[in-house]
Every structure is written in structure tokens, then in C-alpha cells.
Amino acid sequence: MPLEGEAAHAYPPGFRQGCGADLEVTRQEVAGKTKTAPQAAANVGVRASQLSLSFVIESWAACAPGVETPQRWSQWAAAPWLPEGEPQVALAAVAPMLRRRFAPLGRLAAQAALDLAGDKRLDADADLDDNPTVYASRYGETGRCLDLLADQARGDALSPTAFGLSVHNAIGAMIALARGDRRNSSAIAAGRATAAAGVVEAMALLEDGAQAASLVVYDSPLPAGYAQFEDEPSAHFAWAWRLRKPRAGERALHLDWQAENTDDDAPHPQLPASLQALWFGLSDATELVQQADGRRCVWSRDA
């Protein structure tokens, strides 16, 4: 079904091609004093608690149960639905010894990241560009964390391997190992604003000198022990965008982020916020407004 209040929209032509950041810091309020920061390329502005960005999605990839091909994502973008079922990701491009360390969530994230990169492995002496990767997940490997807490409650010894695989940057680290990738990466979480925060992080890296940045967003439903804390629809999914700054006259996407002193969230959505962001990137919708946790995020695109 289409998102509430939105018409069905056509899917952009070409798998792994999209539309939509460049960073400009204009003015910044710090401790009641105004500081003027260096001007960059006029595609990101920061003022007090407000942030505006413009960006291009150079390529994309996505993976979810029942939505594994470009054709299925085309159908999904035209009339979104909440993916159901358990992920079945073979991850054939990853060596068996490393592949067995990936839990289902990690397999989804790895598949999206590898699809975005074209399954290309980087040799140790490869001439790498400086393009970093941002991994963004609201919950990450919460199931592994809960298992460790259960072991501790029983008085069992904690497995160093299990602990290492439970930390928030573990999935990104294993993907880097699978690809032989020694470039910069980071892992973030920001509640329902995780996808938007991932774009902000990627754009900051572009402003720091990278020519492009990859954003990998992934999540799964909370385990049963934490299910009572779910506050939005949940599903297994992962998607990846390759982001760059827009060129002069190029059609771009925009993200406006601001703090709002309100506890009133938007109506209960049909999709989790991170899947809403993917839908907006793949569709021709002109605007998507997300409001939660004291933040208001407005996604828009050039006509």
C-alpha cells in the first residue's frame, strides 16, 4: 500500500542509480555567541539547532525479505509495503570462515554494501580512493547483546568473540575484512532519525575532503526480550547509498533537520523511519516529513 497521504510514485530508471550533498557551514551559535565558519560550496547550512543539506545519490542497493531484485524494489517504491519474513542472504561473495560470523542482520548489511560496491574486493596494494563509509543502525546487533546479558545473569563466562561481534561497528568491520577495505568508516545510531543522521555524517565526511561517501543503513526487529520497546513498525532490511555533492544545475535531494520542542510525533507510520527514507530516495515524491524524538526532518527534491 502507498504511504499514508502519498500517491504512488514511479521508480527512477536504472538499478543503483538515483537522484540525490555538499556541505556549507554558514553560522553557528555556541554558548550564546555567534561564530562565522568557513564558507564551502553552499549545499549545507548550519544555524544553531537547524541543519540544511543538499546531496546526490550516485548509486544505490537494497536488500529485504521478498524484495531482492531491482524489479521488486521498483514495485515497492511505487506502492510501499512493510517487508515480512526472515532474511535469506547467501552472501556467496564472502569467504566461508568469515561468513559464518555474520548474523542475519549483518548478512543483510553486507549484501547491500557489496552490491553497492559491485562485489569488488580490494587487494592489499590497491590504489584506494578516500571514499569513507558510514554504517547506520538504530539497534544494531541487539540480539547478540541480549544473549551476552543472559550469559552474565547466569554467571557464565562471556565469550570475547561474541562480545566483539556485538559492538556497533562490528558489522562494518567484518564487511571491511571481506573486501580488504582499509578506508575510514564509522558506525552511528540516532533513534528514529538514524537514516537522516547517517546522511549528516556522510556529508560531514565529504566536507572533510572525500569525493564520495557510502551510507549503509540496516535494522531488524528487536528480540523478544526488548519487543515492548518497539515504537515503530519493524522489519529486516538494509540499503546503501553512494552520496556525493551536486554539480552546478544538477537535480538534488535536500534534508532539513531542526530541533522541535514538542513531544507530539507524526501519525504512526506504515514503515520504519529508515525505510521511509529509502522510499523517498527511490520515488519521485517531492517531500517527506519525519518528526520524532524532538527532531523534525524534511526530505525534499528539486523539481
Where do the protein language model's features map onto the residues?
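Conserved "HGTGT" condensation-loop signature of ketosynthase/thiolase-family condensing enzymes
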Residues: 1-140, 144-162, 167-185, 217-303
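Active-site-proximal alpha-helical scaffold in enzymes
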Residues: 110-114, 119, 189-213
